[in-house]
């Protein structure tokens, strides 16, 4: 009688390598599909995490009215809620070159303007045309003899200064924003500004931060008022030395 014995078989190393490779390809592909389909949700979640941990970073600009400073940080928390807001370009991209407005037109993936592109950049998401117009009026480098298409520095301090000067120009808004803020009419101010920054509410592009903005403003205002008080005390102490 012929007896058959089972032969112990060992896995083929080449076959195992091929299986691992195929599995990795499948996992990478699935990951890309998941990320693409959930990119906006992931972005919103990350914004909430950053906001809860860091709030809205202090301004680079020193001085100025604390009520307006708090408003500027509130605009930033809705428009550019990232770790380095001054360097942000629309879509969550970053630029290292702030010698001038980045002027990169990034495709808009969702919302009513889908299919168009946006040049919004910096902490306050200035469009290139808006930056040029407002820099001509409010940038420290501006002058009556400056040509209209002059390339103004987009460094962080100038982003702050241009916006501060714009917000405090009553003629630009036909309202006294500082007085409204001191009367705690922040909702009225946000509505006034919403045609310019639509994420502030009352517009067409609310985001996860929009409904929290009045509360965010009041929190930031308390920080700015405290900082101003500390600065005044320090100055007083220096004068008494």
PLM feature spans:
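Cell-wall polysaccharide-cleaving catalytic domain and substrate-binding groove, primarily
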Residues: 20-149, 162-175, 179-241
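Hydrophobic (often cysteine-bearing) scaffold residues that line and stabilize catalytic clefts
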Residues: 159
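N-terminal Lys/Arg-rich, disordered targeting/topogenic segments
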Residues: 1-14
């Amino acid at each position: 009688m012929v007896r058959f014995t089972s032969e112990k078989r060992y896995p083929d190393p080449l076959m195992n390598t091929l299986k691992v490779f195929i599995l990795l390809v499948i996992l990478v592909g699935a990951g890309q599909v998941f990320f693409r389909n959930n990119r906006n949700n992931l972005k919103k979640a990350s914004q909430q995490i950053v906001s809860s941990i860091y709030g809205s970073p202090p301004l680079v600009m020193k001085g100025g009215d604390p009520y307006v400073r708090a408003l500027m940080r509130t605009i930033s928390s809705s428009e550019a809620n990232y770790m380095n807001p001054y360097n942000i370009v629309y879509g969550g991209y970053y630029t290292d070159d702030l010698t001038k407005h980045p002027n990169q037109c990034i495709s808009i993936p969702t919302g009513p303007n889908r299919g168009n592109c946006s040049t919004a950049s910096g902490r306050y998401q200035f469009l290139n045309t808006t930056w040029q117009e407002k820099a001509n009026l409010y940038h420290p480098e501006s002058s009556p003899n400056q040509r209209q298409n002059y390339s103004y520095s987009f460094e962080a301090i100038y982003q702050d200064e241009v916006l501060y000067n714009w917000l405090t120009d009553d003629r630009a808004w036909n309202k006294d924003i500082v007085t409204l803020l001191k009367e705690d009419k922040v909702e009225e101010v946000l509505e006034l500004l919403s045609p310019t920054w639509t994420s502030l509410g009352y517009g067409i592009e609310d985001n996860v931060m929009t409904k929290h903005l009045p509360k965010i403003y009041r929190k930031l205002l308390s920080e700015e008022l405290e900082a101003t008080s500390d600065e005044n005390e320090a100055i007083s102490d220096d004068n008494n030395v």
